[in-house]
Amino acid sequence: MTSFNSGRPVHVVIPARYGSTRLPGKPLVDLAGEPMIARVHARVSRALPGADIVVAIDDARIAAALDARGIRFAMTGAHHASGTDRAAELARVSGWHDTDVVLNVQGDEPLVPEALLKAFADFCVAAPDLGIATVACPVGDAALLDEPGIVKLVVDRRGRALYFSRAAIPFCRDGRSAGADLGGHLRHIGLYGYSNAALQALAHTAPCELEQLEQLEQLRALWLGMPIDVMRWPDAPPAGVDTPDDVARVVSLLKRQTQDETEPY
C-alpha cells in the first residue's frame, strides 16, 4: 500500500458489479481490446503507483478476467445496493484501521484522468480530520443546470458540501440570462474518499428520505451530519459507461488516444 508520505495507509477500491439493467456484464465490456474493468485498473495503477488497489467484485466471470491479467480482486456479496457498500465490506473483512484512507473509484469510468486521481488522493491524505471527500467542477454550460443526470452541489465557506441535488442549485430567483456567469454553480464528480470509520458508519445506516427522493447516496452522509470535503477540479472528466452508445463513444476516444500516442512527430 502507499501512504503518500503521510504515514496514513491508503487503499483504492474499484467496485465492479456484473449485473446491469442497461448494460449486462458491464465490467467485462470490450473497450478496444480490453475489458472495461482492466482499463480502469490500469488508469488507477498509473496514477497511484504502489497503491493498495483492489477490485471488489460479485461474479466469477469478472474474477476470471482479472485473474488472467494478474489484477488483485476480492469477492464481495451480490446483495450490495452500491459500490459504497461493496467497499465497506472489503474494508471490514480486510481489517483496515478506522483512520485508513479508502478511495472509491467507480468501475465504469475508464477515462478518468490520471491527474485527477493523483490530486484527489493527495487531497484526501492531506485532510487531517478526513471523514468523507469528493470532487466538484464548474457546471460550465447553463443547459446542464436542469439536466437531472448532472448532479449539482453547493458548499460552505470551508469548501464542505451543504447539499447535492439533481435540480438546479443554487436557484437563481431572478432567472438566468443567456451568457450569465455560472461561477457559483458546481457539478459533482463521482470520486469518493473516506476514513474507514466514516465508510463503515455510512454503510451501516439505512437510506434516508432525502437520499431516496433524489437517488443520491451522499445525502445519507449529510443527513447523518458527516462533513464532506469538496476538492475543486477545473473541468468535468469524460463521462462513464452506462449504455451501448457510451461504449461506442469510449472506444472511439481510446482509439483516438492510441493514434495520437503512436503518430510520429
Curated annotation (Swiss-Prot):
Q: What is its EC number?
A: 2.7.7.38
Associated pathway: Nucleotide-sugar biosynthesis; CMP-3-deoxy-D-manno-octulosonate biosynthesis; CMP-3-deoxy-D-manno-octulosonate from 3-deoxy-D-manno-octulosonate and CTP: step 1/1; Bacterial outer membrane biogenesis; lipopolysaccharide biosynthesis
Q: Which reaction does it catalyse?
A: 3-deoxy-alpha-D-manno-oct-2-ulosonate + CTP = CMP-3-deoxy-beta-D-manno-octulosonate + diphosphate
Where does this one sit in the cell?
Cytoplasm
Q: Where this protein primarily resides, as one coarse class? A: cytoplasm
Endpoints of the signal sequence: none
Show the stretches that span the lipid bilayer: none
Q: Does the keyword DNA damage apply?
A: no
Please give the GO cellular component terms listed in this UniProt entry: cytosol
What are the recorded GO MF terms, alphabetically?
A: 3-deoxy-manno-octulosonate cytidylyltransferase activity
KW Transport (keyword) present: no
InterPro entries the record matches: Cytidylyl_trans, KdsB, Nucleotide-diphossugar_trans
User: The organism sits in which domain of life?
Assistant: Bacteria
Q: Which family does it belong to?
A: Belongs to the KdsB family.
Q: Which PANTHER family match?
A: 3-DEOXY-MANNO-OCTULOSONATE CYTIDYLYLTRANSFERASE, 3-DEOXY-MANNO-OCTULOSONATE CYTIDYLYLTRANSFERASE, MITOCHONDRIAL
HAMAP family (UniProt xref)? KdsB
Function as written in the Swiss-Prot or TrEMBL entry = Activates KDO (a required 8-carbon sugar) for incorporation into bacterial lipopolysaccharide in Gram-negative bacteria.
Full protein name: 3-deoxy-manno-octulosonate cytidylyltransferase 2
